[in-house]
């Protein structure tokens, strides 16, 4: 006989509430999708006519350059953040120094400090280093923001790691590098990869900091999107927003899948 007690009823109510909240939060995002196919010269919903002209406009070199810059920067940032964030997580978790709490706070501070304050300070520093409007300027700035997205999940994975596996590997003659490659890395890999995806998203979608360090000759997709929204109301931005939304959804789904695929340490 099916359970129809109060707990089941409460669970169903919670599910309905969660679904309604999710719809309320996501509906404004997905309204952009049909607008991107609108044949109108202004934002209108629902569209009266349908066309792919907005997506054809993305062949403009301005949009292509912005997209290539964003993707290239985001990939480099994801790689650098994965390496630096993993090393930082090892130092934070494995070190017994009392200073590690301060180090952790410093690493995570870019996520706490108002982005405008951080961007202004970074802009003044980059002016002296001639990094404003450069590829590596964007990479450095975005990496600072993205490293915490790797440190947090990798630290959590290391804290739950069974250290006896590493000690057993060492007792069998494996060196630190071999132990890390064959024992530690396979266990924390889902955390590293999910952190890398979040770092990629952080860089690809970042606009406030990019506005401080961009130049007329080097800019990212969010910056170009902001320019179009402030200079002229161009419906092409709906197509760009849909493209960004698709990439973000794909990356989030992949990150969630990787995060859920934690290897069983009993099988190692």
Question: Which residues are covered by each model-predicted region?
Answer:
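N-terminal, non-cleaved signal-anchor transmembrane helix
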Residues: 1-64, 68, 72, 254, ...
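Transmembrane-helix boundary motif in ABC transporter permease subunits
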Residues: 2-7, 75-107, 124, 180, ...
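C-terminal transmembrane helix and the adjacent membrane-cytosol boundary/short C-terminal tail
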Residues: 2-16, 99, 155-166, 170, ...
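Interhelical loop and adjacent transmembrane-helix boundary motif
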Residues: 4-11, 40-42, 55-62, 204-254
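Transmembrane alpha-helices
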Residues: 17, 22-29, 143-144, 151-155, ...
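Hydrophobic alpha-helical transmembrane segments of multipass integral membrane proteins
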Residues: 23, 64, 68, 72-84, ...
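A structural signal for multi-pass alpha-helical bundles of membrane permease subunits
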Residues: 27-40, 69, 119-129, 197-203, ...
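Generic hydrophobic transmembrane alpha-helix motif, especially the helices
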Residues: 104-138, 149, 190-193
